[in-house]
Amino acid sequence: MDPITRPIRVIYDTKSWEYRSKTWLAYLGVFGLACGDTVRYTIGWTGLGIWSGVLFIATLWMLARSNPIETIKRIPWSMIALYGALLLSAALSNYWLISVGAVVITAITGTFGLWLAHAFDWRHLVRIFANVSRFVLASSLLFEFYAAAILRGRILPFFKNFEGEIVPAKAYYWTQGNLFNGDRIQGILGNANLLAYVSMIALIVFAVEFAIIGTSRWISIASLASAVLCLSLSKSVGIGFAVAAVLVSAVVSLAAEGQPKDVRHRYYRVAWVAAGIFAVAVWLMRGEIFTALGKSPDMTGRTMIWKKVLGLIWDRPFQGYGWLSYWMPGIEPYEGLVVINKVSYYQAHNAFLDMWLQGGILALIIFTVMLFITFVKLWQLAVRHTSSLYLWPILVFIGLIVQNFTESRLLSELGWVLLTLFVIKVREPEEMLEPLGRSPKRVRLLYRGLRRNRSQ
């Protein structure tokens, strides 16, 4: 790019009201979307509704006053078509009014992702997600320590999620106080899988933050340690596979940068073949693998859930049952469909099956195409730019995709916001990116590491 036409990087006035207000709105929004159960357990469904409504109004106000036209123009045809397919499934649903409302709620959730893409650059975004993750993980560890060491027992939510005085199952507790007994911890999120999900994202943004922003060495070490600790204590096998995919992707992207096209593509072919062989081996040997990892051979009931979901899909493969995102209690065919150990489950535990089940085959095809295009664009951004900053979007994206073969988090809350953010922001013109360096990321990271070691 011509140096004359390259835009000058804006240095934000971090003490200005505008900067602080939008940053705090982002903090509160990301926290609420990542920790929705935490908010609900603390202030109830009514409080959660008020919280969400206030944040949505604030987001609309921030968006409207900042001239978002160019960002809105970057919304791709695939995302617009996906919303259209979801509305079509709602129109053909037996509970069409509820389904239309669910599409609206999904669009409202996506609006926050649109605003994040518009209001912040990639560097500011990594700080936002890092700071929120630090708070969530530190609070989770303190919460678990309080339950296990001081209270020495389980903690119920302030607003319980069951009727009567008898707790139906352990899953209804906010935390089970397992910090010292070897079982899974739940943290302030109230769910071990959610804690692992946030920990995976945290691990990525902490590493990138350490590489590019120059955060205090001790803060970075403590942050990375908390992410690793929460990952290990939450014991999510699905997230374990996702983290492995993230690590392999990071190595491949660093190795491929700056290489000739034929060399890059050779790396990619080897990586894809290895990933395919690994995935097939895991599926064929899932019983032995999951038993060795201390899990049930059916992946904690997932194979049973998938069989039931596929049975429903074959009854309405084209139009779907109508979009809901999370399955709604009391609605057929979801009420009582999946009950494990007295706990009802309201997702297919696979984002692709859930999209097909609810939105129909058209929504699934559009969704898959949108993910593929976004993956390619994010990968190109990570490999072609010399700054480590642009690694975090593709690594988080890959982690989300792999995790959502055993979960459906991508279709709601923080998952949908991140997907919307990546789908839109990756389409920003090159002029809005940071300047290219003279050496590949792997060289700069090695030099930075050596320099830090010498300074110790």
Show where each model-derived region lies.
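Transmembrane signal-anchor hairpin modules in multi-pass inner-membrane enzymes, especially those
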Residues: 1-94, 124, 428-456
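A membrane-periplasm/extracellular boundary helix in multi-pass inner-membrane enzymes
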Residues: 142, 146-151, 251-297, 312-315, ...
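Helix-loop-helix junctions and helix-breaking kinks within/between transmembrane helices
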Residues: 39-50, 92, 96-104, 191-193, ...
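Long extracytoplasmic/lumenal interhelical loops at the membrane interface
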Residues: 288-307, 311, 315, 319-359, ...
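Alpha-helical transmembrane segments of multi-pass inner-membrane proteins
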Residues: 130-253
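Transmembrane alpha-helical segments and their membrane-water interfaces
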Residues: 94-150
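Hydrophobic transmembrane alpha-helices and their immediate junctions
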Residues: 359-398, 434
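Transmembrane alpha-helices of multi-pass inner-membrane enzymes
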Residues: 394-456
